[in-house]
Curated annotation (Swiss-Prot):
This is Lysosomal acid glucosylceramidase. Its main location: membrane. Residues 1-39 form the signal peptide. Interacts with saposin-C. Interacts with SCARB2. Interacts with TCP1. Interacts with GRN; this interaction prevents aggregation of GBA1-SCARB2 complex via interaction with HSPA1A upon stress. Glucosylceramidase that catalyzes, within the lysosomal compartment, the hydrolysis of glucosylceramides/GlcCers (such as beta-D-glucosyl-(1<->1')-N-acylsphing-4-enine) into free ceramides (such as N-acylsphing-4-enine) and glucose. Plays a central role in the degradation of complex lipids and the turnover of cellular membranes. Through the production of ceramides, participates in the PKC-activated salvage pathway of ceramide formation. Catalyzes the glucosylation of cholesterol, through a transglucosylation reaction where glucose is transferred from GlcCer to cholesterol. GO terms for cellular component: endoplasmic reticulum; Golgi apparatus; lysosomal membrane; lysosome; trans-Golgi network. The gene is GBA1. It comes from Pan troglodytes. The active site is at E274, E379. GO terms for molecular function: galactosylceramidase activity; glucosylceramidase activity; glucosyltransferase activity; scavenger receptor binding; steryl-beta-glucosidase activity. It comes from the Eukaryota. It catalyses: a beta-D-glucosyl-(1<->1')-N-acylsphing-4-enine + H2O = an N-acylsphing-4-enine + D-glucose; a beta-D-galactosyl-(1<->1')-N-acylsphing-4-enine + H2O = an N-acylsphing-4-enine + D-galactose; cholesteryl 3-beta-D-glucoside + H2O = cholesterol + D-glucose; a beta-D-glucosyl-(1<->1')-N-acylsphing-4-enine + cholesterol = cholesteryl 3-beta-D-glucoside + an N-acylsphing-4-enine. The keyword RNA-binding does not apply. Its EC number is 3.2.1.45, 2.4.1.-, 3.2.1.-, 3.2.1.46. Belongs to the glycosyl hydrolase 30 family.
């Protein structure tokens, strides 16, 4: 498929919200509009002058959805979001026995099986927790429901920073007493006990699906570091296998122990958030530098054995947790060493330099070399680059950047995709170094209101409809086109296809499933759709 450039931001034209049938569908297929059912509430749109709208939520109202609908055999569900203001609106269609369309044909190839999906989610940073808890309790609950419940978009991944990061309001670790090599003074501060942990428990209670927790450290205690500071160029003192590295490895176990005391178990930890950052002079916020060779030896001699010999031996270890530009080199260094490789379950990647690193040459090549090591996208956000505005309320372009990234990652063997902060304030913070960025949910505490951005719904087109255990399958286009598309099978054998149109042109479209027939539809300009149907 060919990828078109993202559109220039323009102010939206108001759209009616009564029927979801686009006028351009006439003559192809009349998709039957589905009225808002008892559990579903429509978006209350608000424009801030960017290319689309946000949906406004407060203590008494928030848009919501019914659980995903799999209609009777021979029909399909279609969920639509558009730049003009539709937000995951449901319609139903009939699967045709014969192909009558003349446009693009996407053919499902269920016999071509690829990776199984782990899931989708976001990070419970200190900043996210502060913003959520600044709302009134009813508004807090609606925000958490929006992300984690069946009424929302069904997140099943939460990334948790181990101690502070830039999205904290102070710098701290869990062991700031100098030379405490036995970690006797290791303790969780109120950021964990009063903010993150209670919110994570509330999210787990709301979720219908099992939620997996992923932990990542930004910096070690400063007394373990060569530069004696949380930020800037610095790595662990000494060499792998020594007291500094062993202490840092045991810090991971102490963290897992402490959260277990609060009845929270982790699916995975990453060896270090962005290990390349701590190799850069003047790096502005929390970091800990590792070269690939240093990470290899730390995993082989310290972190891997320490986790394996602890009560947390089932916790998965993910390497890298940095830009995919570093692949496949970083993977080659670590995974060609059998002592390190035996402890590594997966490779975590961040999205920030993706424009410099084609997916095929990085993700694709890494999968070719190490097909049994999973790839997992662990962090993404927009607004972080110096030329970008931090927050653009209602930006459709930023939503398209998310869904384009998710589809590309899925097409190159990645098993999950994790957003950064679950919620930020209108400035894009708080952040102790003022590294403000955007978020799918922006909280305005002055109004006890939060805004669900296009990014939220673009993510929802995947997270709500692709449960853990779904498997990507083949999908072949009949001609070059400007759409991004991916197909998956649910564990029960039903099908899901997500189609993103980043161009201004409407694209007539047929999806062919050899088992059931043809789905005649259209992909309007600047839209994203999720299609669901039963195959038996």
């Amino acid at each position: 498929m060919e990828f078109s450039s993202p559109s220039r931001e323009e102010c939206p034209k108001p759209s009616g919200r009564v029927s979801i049938m686009a006028g351009s569908l006439t003559g192809l297929l009349l998709l039957q509009a589905v009225s808002w059912a008892s559990g579903a509430r429509p978006c209350i749109p608000k424009s801030f002058g960017y290319s689309s709208v946000v949906c406004v939520c407060n203590a008494t109202y928030c848009d919501s959805f019914d659980p995903p609908t799999f209609p009777a055999l021979g029909t399909f569900s279609r969920y639509e979001s558009t730049r003009s203001g539709r937000r995951m609106e449901l319609s139903m269609g009939t699967i045709q026995a014969n192909h009558t369309g003349t446009g693009l044909l996407l053919t499902l190839q269920p016999e071509q099986k690829f990776q199984k999906v782990k899931g989708f989610g976001g990070a419970m940073t200190d900043a996210a927790a502060l913003n959520i808890l600044a709302l009134s309790p009813p508004a807090q609950n609606l925000l958490l429901k929006s992300y984690f419940s069946e009424e929302g978009i069904g997140y099943n991944i939460i990334r948790v920073p181990m101690a502070s990061c830039d999205f904290s309001i102070r710098t701290y670790t869990y062991a700031d007493t100098p030379d405490d090599f036995q970690l006797h003074n290791f303790s969780l501060p109120e950021e964990d006990t009063k903010l993150k942990i209670p919110l994570i428990h509330r999210a787990l209670q709301l979720a219908q699906r099992p939620v997996s927790l992923l932990a990542s450290p930004w910096t070690s205690p400063t007394w373990l570091k060569t530069n004696g500071a949380v930020n800037g160029k610095g790595s662990l003192k000494g060499q792998p296998g020594d007291i500094y590295h062993q202490t840092w490895a045991r810090y991971f176990v102490k963290f897992l122990d402490a959260y277990a005391e609060h009845k929270l178990q982790f699916w995975a930890v990453t060896a270090e958030n962005e290990p390349s950052a701590g190799l850069l002079s003047g790096y502005p916020f929390q970091c800990l530098g590792f070269t690939p060779e240093h990470q290899r030896d730390f995993i082989a001699r310290d972190l891997g054995p320490t986790l394996a010999n602890s009560t947390h031996h089932n916790v998965r270890l993910l390497m890298l947790d940095d830009q995919r530009l570093l692949l496949p080199h970083w993977a080659k260094v670590v995974l060609t060493d059998p002592e390190a490789a035996k402890y590594v379950h997966g490779i975590a990647v961040h999205w920030y330099l993706d424009f410099l690193a084609p997916a095929k040459a990085t993700l694709g090549e890494t999968h070719r070399l190490f097909p049994n090591t999973m790839l997992f996208a662990s962090e993404a956000c927009v607004g972080s680059k110096f030329w970008e505005q931090s927050v653009r309320l209602g930006s459709w372009d930023r939503g398209m950047q998310y869904s384009h990234s998710i589809i590309t990652n899925l097409l190159y063997h990645v098993v999950g995709w994790t957003d950064w902060n679950l919620a930020l304030n209108p400035e894009g913070g708080p952040n102790w170094v003022r590294n403000f960025v955007d978020s799918p949910i922006i909280v305005d505490i002055t109004k006890d209101t939060f805004y669900k951005q296009p990014m939220f719904y673009h993510l929802g087109h995947f997270s709500k409809f692709i449960p853990e255990g779904s498997q990507r399958v083949g999908l072949v286009a009949s001609q070059k086109n400007d759409l991004d598309a991916v197909a998956l099978m649910h564990p029960d054998g039903s099908a899901v296809v997500v189609v993103l149109n980043r161009s201004s042109k409407d694209v007539p479209l047929t999806i062919k499933d050899p088992a059931v027939g043809f789905l005649e539809t259209i992909s309007p300009g600047y839209s994203i759709h999720t299609y669901l149907w039963r195959r038996q």
